[in-house]
C-alpha cells in the first residue's frame, strides 16, 4: 500500500518547476518549428482569416507593430500586432485580468516573393510565437527592386518594384515632421538610379537644395513670361462682363508659352545628361498663374509621351499636392480652376498607357483631388490625425489598420499596394539618418549673402524673402493677386 511521502521543506516564496525545462524547450521547438522560440500567447474566439485575436500574459514583452507567427498545415504564417485591450474572466466567481491582442495577417514569407496571404486561420488555443526569436532570410531583389523599410521586430525588409511604383501611381501621405518628404526624396533617388525620368513639381524650394547632387535641370518660364501671364489673368478677372477680348489675349499668350515649354520638355526627356527636373515657380504670387503653368508643363509631358510611346519611363512628383491638385468640385472654386485641375487629373487616368506615373506627396489628404488619389495603386501612409483623411483611407486599408495611423511614430508608416511584395497592408519602419537631418537644416537656412529680394532673389531659393514669396503660392484660396507693379484693386 502506498504511503504519503514526506513533504519537502521549501523556503517561503520559492517557485519550483513542475516539469523538465529541456523537454519543454523541445516541445516548443516541435510546435513552432524554430529552436529557442518565444511563446507569447494562444488564439481565442472571434479570430478571422485576416485578423487574429489571442490572449497573452500581462508580462509579455510585445508591442504595437511587432510580428508573431504560428503554424497552420505545416506552414509558418506571420501576423502583425495592431491593437490590444484588457479583458476579465471569471472562474467560480474569481475574476482574472488578461490582455487580448489583435493582429493582422501578413501571410507566408519567402525571400523571393515577400509576403503572400494565406487562405485560412489557426485553430482555437493554437500557440503563437514572437518573430524576434528567429532569423529570416533577407529579401532577394532584382535590379528593378529596392527596400523601402523594415518590418518591426524582424530582420525582414519590405521590397518595392520601381516599374509598378511609377506606372500605377503612388501616394505618400502624412502630417509635417513624420518623415514623409525624406521618404519621397529617397524614392526619387531610387527612380533616377534606375533610369526613370523624374519631374518634380515643388513650390517649397526643398527639392532643389536636397537633390542638388543629382544635377537637376530647372525648366520654367522666363520672368518676363511669368509676369505677362499674371497680367493677362488679372485682366480676365477684372475686365468687363465676359472679358471676351481679354480671354482671347490670354489664349494667345498661353499658346506662345506652349511652344517654349515643348522645347524645354523635349530637351529634358531626350537628354542623357540628367534624369531629374525640378519645376519651381517661386516668383509667381497669383495662384491661378501657378496652376496654369503647372498644367501647361504636365500636359506637355503627356503630349511628348503620346508621341514617343513608352520611349522613356516618366515619374511626376507633386510635392504639397493639395496646393496643385486640390479637391475643387463643390468647394467654391471657379470653373477655370476646376478645368485646370481636371486636366492634371487626366494624367492619373491615362498616364499608364504612355509610361507616365504620378507620385502624390501631401500632408492634407482630405484636400487633394479624390479623382487623382483614387487612381493611386500604392500608398505609404505616415501619421494622420484628421477624421476626413482617415475616412478616405478606410477604402484603402481595413478599418483596423486605419485606427493604427494616428498612433504611428516618426519614420513609421503603413504600406500597401501593387508596387510592394506584400499582399496585405504592412506597418514598416525606417531608421533615422543624422546626415539627412543636417541636409534638411542647410536647406532651410536663410542665405544672408543673397543680395536680392523677392523677384530678384539670386541665391537659388534659400533666402527668407524668396520663401516669403514662395509661400504665397501655397494657399487654397484662389483669389486673384495683382502682379507686381499693378498695385491694388
Model feature map: region roles:
Residues 270-271, 412-489:
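Conserved P-loop NTPase motor module
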Amino acid at each position: 500500500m502506498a504511503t504519503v511521502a514526506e513533504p519537502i521543506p521549501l523556503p517561503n516564496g520559492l517557485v519550483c518547476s513542475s516539469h523538465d525545462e529541456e523537454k519543454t524547450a523541445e516541445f516548443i521547438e516541435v510546435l513552432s518549428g524554430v529552436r529557442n522560440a518565444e511563446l507569447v500567447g494562444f488564439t481565442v474566439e472571434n479570430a478571422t482569416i485576416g485578423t487574429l485575436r489571442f490572449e497573452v500574459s500581462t508580462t509579455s514583452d510585445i508591442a504595437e507593430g511587432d510580428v508573431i507567427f504560428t503554424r497552420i498545415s505545416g506552414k509558418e504564417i506571420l501576423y502583425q500586432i495592431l491593437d490590444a485591450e484588457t479583458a476579465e474572466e471569471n472562474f467560480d466567481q474569481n475574476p482574472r485580468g488578461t490582455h487580448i491582442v489583435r493582429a493582422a495577417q501578413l501571410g507566408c514569407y519567402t525571400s523571393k516573393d515577400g509576403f503572400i496571404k494565406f487562405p485560412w486561420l489557426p485553430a482555437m488555443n493554437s500557440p503563437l510565437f514572437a518573430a524576434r526569436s528567429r532569423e529570416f532570410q533577407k529579401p532577394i531583389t532584382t535590379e528593378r527592386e529596392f527596400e523601402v523599410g523594415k518590418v518591426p521586430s524582424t530582420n525582414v525588409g519590405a521590397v518595392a518594384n520601381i516599374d509598378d511604383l511609377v506606372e500605377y501611381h503612388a501616394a505618400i501621405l502624412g502630417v509635417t515632421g513624420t518623415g514623409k518628404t525624406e521618404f519621397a526624396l529617397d524614392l526619387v533617388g531610387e527612380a533616377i538610379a534606375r533610369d526613370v525620368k523624374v519631374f518634380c513639381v515643388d513650390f517649397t524650394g526643398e527639392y532643389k537644395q536636397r537633390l542638388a547632387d543629382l544635377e537637376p535641370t530647372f525648366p520654367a518660364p522666363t520672368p518676363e513670361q511669368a509676369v505677362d501671364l499674371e497680367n493677362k489673368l488679372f485682366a480676365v478677372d477684372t475686365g468687363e462682363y465676359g472679358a471676351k477680348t481679354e480671354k482671347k489675349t490670354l489664349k494667345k499668350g498661353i499658346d506662345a508659352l506652349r511652344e517654349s515649354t515643348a522645347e524645354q520638355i523635349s530637351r529634358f526627356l531626350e537628354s542623357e545628361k540628367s534624369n531629374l527636373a525640378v519645376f519651381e515657380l517661386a516668383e509667381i504670387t497669383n495662384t491661378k498663374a501657378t496652376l496654369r503653368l503647372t498644367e501647361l508643363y504636365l500636359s506637355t509631358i503627356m503630349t511628348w509621351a503620346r508621341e514617343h510611346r513608352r520611349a522613356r519611363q516618366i515619374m511626376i512628383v507633386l510635392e504639397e499636392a493639395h496646393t496643385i491638385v486640390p479637391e475643387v468640385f463643390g468647394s467654391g472654386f471657379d470653373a477655370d480652376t476646376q478645368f485646370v485641375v481636371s486636366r492634371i487629373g487626366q494624367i492619373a487616368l491615362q498616364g499608364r498607357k504612355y509610361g507616365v506615373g504620378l507620385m502624390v506627396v501631401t500632408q492634407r489628404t482630405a484636400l487633394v483631388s479624390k479623382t487623382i488619389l483614387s487612381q493611386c495603386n500604392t500608398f505609404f501612409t505616415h501619421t494622420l490625425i484628421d477624421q476626413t483623411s482617415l475616412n478616405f483611407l478606410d477604402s484603402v486599408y481595413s478599418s483596423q489598420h486605419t485606427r493604427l495611423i494616428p498612433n504611428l511614430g516618426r519614420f513609421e508608416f503603413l504600406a500597401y499596394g501593387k508596387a510592394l511584395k506584400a499582399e496585405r497592408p504592412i506597418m514598416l519602419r525606417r531608421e533615422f539618418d543624422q546626415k539627412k537631418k543636417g541636409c534638411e537644416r542647410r536647406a532651410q537656412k536663410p542665405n544672408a549673402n543673397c543680395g536680392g529680394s523677392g523677384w530678384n532673389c539670386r541665391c537659388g531659393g534659400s533666402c527668407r524673402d524668396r520663401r516669403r514669396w514662395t509661400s504665397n503660392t501655397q494657399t487654397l484660396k484662389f483669389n486673384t493677386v495683382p502682379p507686381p507693379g499693378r498695385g491694388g484693386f
